[in-house]
């Protein structure tokens, strides 16, 4: 875990640090994936933030790697005091949307994140819920009700994203908003 931890330690929470390089390293050496997951529990906030960033990037192309860790990631998404960790994990749940068995647990966590103190976390939580709702129309009515409350959010950015999500969920003919779904598996399905 030496090199991985060194790279994750570089920079602070205002930067991505070396998360891109960590993501490339772990993607090319999958045996390091458990070490990346372990870094989410490290005491240093920047390490956890950069680990979550790298994990999100890996989950775009390898969402199946994350499945065994879903319970721990759900706990971290709710409990970690670092907003960067919470928003990247909210994004990961969107990458998992193509795996039907993850949708219920992911929705429960994302619903809680809709009330997060960070506007960025709320924004990515509603985005991932929108992805799930688009892929699973049976979940869409409940998700639509939850997201509609965010059209009155204190953050203008969250209000705007909530309105766009509602349009996307209620009009299947609309293309999915560019930049919202970043994972290969999800992009092919929304």
Model segments located where?
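Amphipathic alpha-helical scaffolding segments comprising HEAT/armadillo-like alpha-solenoid repeats
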Residues: 1-5, 29-40, 63-76, 101-113, ...
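N-terminal alpha-helical scaffold/docking segments in eukaryotic complex subunits
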Residues: 1-48, 167-171, 182-190
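Alpha-solenoid HEAT/ARM repeat scaffold
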Residues: 5, 16-20, 34, 49-52, ...
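Alpha-solenoid HEAT/Armadillo repeat architecture
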Residues: 9-12, 27, 41, 59-60, ...
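Alpha-helix N-cap/helix-start positions at coil->helix boundaries
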Residues: 13-16, 45-46, 79, 83-84, ...
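A glycine-rich, hydrophobic loop/mini-helix early in the fold
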Residues: 42-76, 80
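Structural signature of alpha-helical solenoid repeat scaffolds
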Residues: 56, 94, 130-131, 167
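Hydrophobic secondary-structure block in the mid-to-C-terminal portion of proteins
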Residues: 131-190
């Amino acid at each position: 875990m030496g090199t991985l931890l060194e790279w994750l330690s570089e920079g602070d929470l205002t930067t991505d640090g070396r998360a891109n390089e960590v993501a490339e390293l772990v993607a090319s050496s999958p045996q390091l994936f458990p070490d990346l997951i372990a870094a989410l529990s490290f005491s240093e906030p920047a390490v956890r933030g950069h680990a979550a960033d790298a994990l999100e990037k890996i989950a775009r192309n390898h969402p199946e790697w994350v499945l065994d860790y879903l319970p721990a990631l759900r706990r971290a998404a709710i409990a970690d005091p670092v907003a960067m960790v919470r928003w990247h994990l909210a994004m990961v749940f969107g990458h998992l949307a193509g795996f039907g068995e993850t949708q219920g647990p992911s929705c429960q966590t994302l619903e809680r994140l809709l009330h997060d103190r960070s506007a960025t976390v709320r924004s990515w939580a509603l985005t991932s819920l929108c992805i799930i709702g688009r892929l699973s129309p049976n979940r869409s009515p409940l998700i639509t009700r939850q997201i509609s409350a965010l059209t009155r959010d204190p953050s203008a950015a969250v209000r705007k994203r909530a309105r766009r999500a509602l349009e996307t969920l209620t009009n299947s003919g609309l293309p999915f908003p560019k930049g919202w779904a970043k994972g290969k598996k999800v992009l092919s399905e929304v």
